[in-house]
Amino acid sequence: MKGLVIKNTGSSYVVLTDEGRTLNCIVKGNFRLKGIRSTNPVAVGDRVEVSYETSSLKAHTSNLHFITEIEDRRNYIIRKSINLSKQSHILAANVDQALLVVTVSKPETSTTFIDRFLASAEAYRVPVVLIFNKTDLLTANELHYQQLMIQLYETVGYECRAISAETGDGVEELRPLLDGKITLLSGNSGVGKSTLINRLVPGANLRTADISDAHQTGMHTTTFSEMIPLTGGQSLCAPTSQGDSPLVRSWLIDTPGIKGFGTFDMEREELTS
C-alpha cells in the first residue's frame, strides 16, 4: 500500500495511507538520496510504499509494517551539521514552500543562518517566505533594524511578513499563503514556531518554552518532525504524488529548532537556473 510519511520519531515513522489508515512503520532496507548519506533516509513528506509481515515471538503474533520504497521526490530541503560530524539531515520532502521564522531579538537570527537556508532552498527549488516574529517585543531601534532587513530581502525577491505569534498580530493574514499547500516551518530554536502553529491550528497544543536568560537562545520544544493538517477532521486522506487530497488541503510541517545551518557544496547553476 502507498502513503505519506507524516511523522518521524527517529527510530520509526507514522504513515498516513491513501485509504486513510495511520500506521507505525520502520524502515526495511537501505535508502540513499543521490549518494548522500543522511541521518534520516526517510523524511516527513515522503511518498512511500508500505508492506507488512507477521512476526511470532514467544507465542505473541503481531503485524510489523515496513517502509520498503520511497517514491521519487520532487524536492527536499537538506542541511549539513555545522559540528565535526558533518552529517546531513533532510528536513522535509515534497514541499510547496517554506516559511522561515526569524527574530531580530530574543533570540537574534543571524543573517548567515538566513542566507544559508535560502541558498539550500533555492538549490532544491523550494520557495521561501520570511516570517519576522515577536514584533511585540521589539524596541524602536530593533523595529528599525527589522524594517531594514525586510527591505533587504524584499529587494532580492523574497516575500517578508512581520507578525507576533504571541498576540496574534498578522497571523490570520498568513492563512492565504498556506491554503492548498504543504508548507515547511523552520527556524532557530526559540523563534516562536510552536506558538505560531498553536495560533494557526487551534487544538494543536504544542509545547512552548522560554528563552534562556543566560545565552538569549531558544530551547528545543519540538523533538521530531510532524505534518499537521490545517483543514480536515480526524479521518485524513494522504495527498497523492499529484498532490490531490479530498479531505486535507493544507499541511504544516513542524520541525525541531535548528541552532546552525550548514550547506553542501553547490554549483553556480544550482542557484541560478
Tell me what each language-model feature is.
Residues K193-A209:
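A conserved segment at the C-terminal end of the G1
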Residues Y13-T17, C25, V50, I67:
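SH3/SH3-like beta-barrel fold
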Residues I90-Q97, V101-V156:
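Phosphate-binding glycine-rich loops and their immediate beta-loop-alpha structural context
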Residues L137-V191:
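Canonical P-loop GTPase G-domain recognition
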Residues M1-G10:
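Structural detector for short beta-strands of small beta-barrel domains
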Residues T22-N40:
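Beta-strand/loop nucleic-acid-binding surfaces
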Residues S11, R37-S56, H60-L64, E71-L91, ...:
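Helix-rich effector regions associated with P-loop NTPase G domains
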